[in-house]
Amino acid sequence: MRDFQSRFADRYNQITNSYSYSSSRQGLITGMVNVGSFFGCLLSSPVADKIGKRLSIIVWTTVYLIGIIIQVTTVPSWVQILVAKIWTGLSIGALSVITPGYQSEVAPAIMRGAIVTTYQLFITLGIFIAACINMGTHKYSHGTTAQWRISIGINLLWGIITLVGIIFLPESPRYLIAIGKDDEALKIMCYNNDLPLEHEIIQTEYHTIKSDCDAELAGGPARWPEIFNANIRYRTFLGMAVMMFQQLTGANYYFYYGTQVFRGTGMDSPYLAALIPDAVNCGCTFGAIFVLEFFGRRSPLIVGGIWQYICFFIYAAVGDRALYHKNGTSNHRAGAVMIVFSCLFIFSFSQTWAPAAYVIVGESYPVRYRSKCAAVATSANWFWNFLISFFTPFITNSIGFKYGYIFASCNLTGAAIIFLFVHETKGRTLEEINTMYASNLKPWMPHPEGYREFGREQNNATLKSHIGLNGETTELIENTDNQGDSGSFQTSTPDDSRPEQNQASATYIRPDKREPRL
């Protein structure tokens, strides 16, 4: 957009009467929002733990609105744009952690995966709407700030919708139980599930959350160094790796620099060319809801990584070898091939890596560490997002479309990481997931039924310890000693001669509790 360039670009060509950016300024303007998002992720955990996720969303949305206002009112100072982007990024990063967590805690268990996937769906919808707005405003007459102020200012609408909408939504039941408001939490759970209080689903979920909160209260809030202790370190680094490779798939190479990328393919309207993959991205994300619920998490990530490797390799090869004729003109057929494989890449990404990475992170951590581990994992995502957005202009100026070979190899590596290290979490309870990661089972090996049964026994024992079974109390006792490679489940019956110990107890002796070392 010429008016935006005339205000913030650092290069002017008198011959062509055009403005352009140096690689450093373009990288900074594009990438500084990710710097703010990185720190916003880390700030999200203490704020949410203190005031709850619902109120946190209100606070961070207000921060977001202030950042947009600063951008819209910018005078010809690119430094103000950078500061405003960092400020806005703080809220975006925090909300990228809090919002999926809020969704997973409020949603009925049977719909949890699908509802969390809508987070990514609305991200893609926002990208598509932004592309449409850019398409409509870039032809505004030169000299008017409407070209870019409308594109930025429209974001105020989404912030206001979020701010008003969250007022009518309930607080997370988990947070309410943690602060002792159990009755209010139960009312919300009954309303969200459309079930009566005495229903087994409500009682099971309530007592599971209650036991989790009691355990967290007994151990105290997790401190940041604890997420790198031996018992959780494996999953902490694994979550960071999954979110890192979500960025290294190269999707944002298209979304950030789509107009520049497709201008090189010979398209007359680069804005229209960039709109095509955005539309594919938005439309195909609807399929992710069914893909993740039907095929799980591991398989879509592995297949998606391989698919995306093939697409990026062909894209890079055509761009490097066939896009330009010897006289320097564009080969439009080669350009069309590149756009097709860009769309095929996004078709896969929008249904696999885009939503599944967030679902994996949301399902993999024990309750006590969840908020901090999710914050660190998501901050890794924003950190690599910044590196890609900042260095892409330098790299493309140096090696052109060969850049795609790097992303192709990263897609293949990401698929290998998922195959080797990530367990399937679909349909498993938190206790089952903890058991899988604490055992020596390999993710690609069949899981013995005993490990799933142990997770169920833990849930049942937790429930019985609260509501009683035939007038008695059942208590689960976990043996923390290493008992070898196999596990067993032992029970003891009440001793009538000792009334003070007249309770049933169950002890599960399981494999090595330590998580695999990286």
From Swiss-Prot:
Coiled coil, from the record: none
Keywords: Membrane, Sugar transport, Transmembrane, Transmembrane helix, Transport
Membrane topology: Multi-pass membrane protein
Name of this chain's protein: Probable high-affinity hexose transporter ght7
UniProt cross-references to Pfam families, sorted A to Z: Sugar_tr
Biological processes per GO annotation: carbohydrate transport; hexose transmembrane transport
Residues passing through the membrane, by range: 28-48, 55-75, 78-98, 113-133, 150-170, 237-257, 272-292, 299-319, 334-354, 375-395, 403-423
Main location: membrane
Stored InterPro entries: MFS_dom, MFS_sugar_transport-like, MFS_Sugar_Transporters, MFS_trans_sf, Sugar/inositol_transpt, Sugar_transporter_CS
One Gene Ontology MF term: hexose transmembrane transporter activity
Residues on Cytoplasmic side: 1-27, 76-77, 134-149, 258-271, 320-333, 396-402
UniProt organism field: Schizosaccharomyces pombe (strain 972 / ATCC 24843) (Fission yeast)
Disulfide bonds: none
Region named Disordered: 477-518
Gene name of the encoded protein: ght7
Biased composition, class Polar residues, residue ranges: 477-506
Family note: Belongs to the major facilitator superfamily. Sugar transporter (TC 2.A.1.1) family.
Alphabetical list of PANTHER family matching this protein: HIGH-AFFINITY HEXOSE TRANSPORTER GHT7-RELATED, PLASTIDIC GLUCOSE TRANSPORTER 4
Compartment(s): Membrane
Cellular component, GO, one term: cytoplasm
Extracellular membrane side: 49-54, 99-112, 171-236, 293-298, 355-374, 424-518
